[in-house]
Amino acid sequence: MNTSDLFEQIPSKRRSLKDLATYIKTKSGNSPNYSIFLGAGASVTSGISSGTQLVEEWRKEIYELSSSSAYTDVKTARQYLIDKESSWYDPTNEYSSLFQKKFDLPAQRRRFVEKQVDSKLPSIDYSYLVSLFQSAYFDTVFTTNFDDLINEAFYQFSRERPTLCAHDSSIKGVSVNSSRPKIIKVHGDYLFDSIKSTLNETESLEINTKEKLIEFTKKYGMIFIGYAGNDRSWIGPYISRHFLSLYPLLVRRRRYSRGERYPSALCGCHSL
């Protein structure tokens, strides 16, 4: 389901950034109304390649190797992969299928991720987000990212120390009612062997992670930042069945190039 489909099916749920800022600000005591969900786009301003950038790079490389032809355009490359490489290529989930093709072994994928995130530091945008946690507008962030930027941001910009859950076994004990900042890594951490990036890996979440995510979305709204929803875990069916019926929806869809700042998402919220 893409943005246009959502706007067409539930136009009454569409909200502006100004509306969102009002919803965030209107809360009772220190209890927030929303949790944050960070995707790969949230790390672009820290110098980490976005999923879109990696897909473009891998598609070109694999097309040229497979076809023995020079890369000309996206449409030609995609059609070739659909026609000739359908045994592994999934056009609806290019990131995972291309990632698995390029890095066949889990150890290779982990080393690639480690190289991507090595020495990267939180951008100023993360300081805005941390300040919102300090003001009790949020207390939980879910993320599909393997980097440690949000955790490092708390140590760099705040005296608060978050609870970090980077493995399924550590998630079960997280309390939805705790006011301490919580970071829950949906796909794991690159330091563990169990990171989830390929098609089969992202099709299923560990049971504790899935249950905790459902528990939080029943109590809080969810604000997505930099997340395209291209994994095949819970996002499609769960949102369709539950999430859209529980909370108003704000959809903001755009691509970020390397070094581009968030135009208003975090900075706008900071004006609270």
Spans of features found by a protein language model:
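Conserved catalytic-core helix/loop/strand module for nucleotide-ribose chemistry
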Residues: 1-221, 229-272
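Extended basic-aromatic, gly/pro-enriched interface segments that bind polyanionic ligands
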Residues: 226
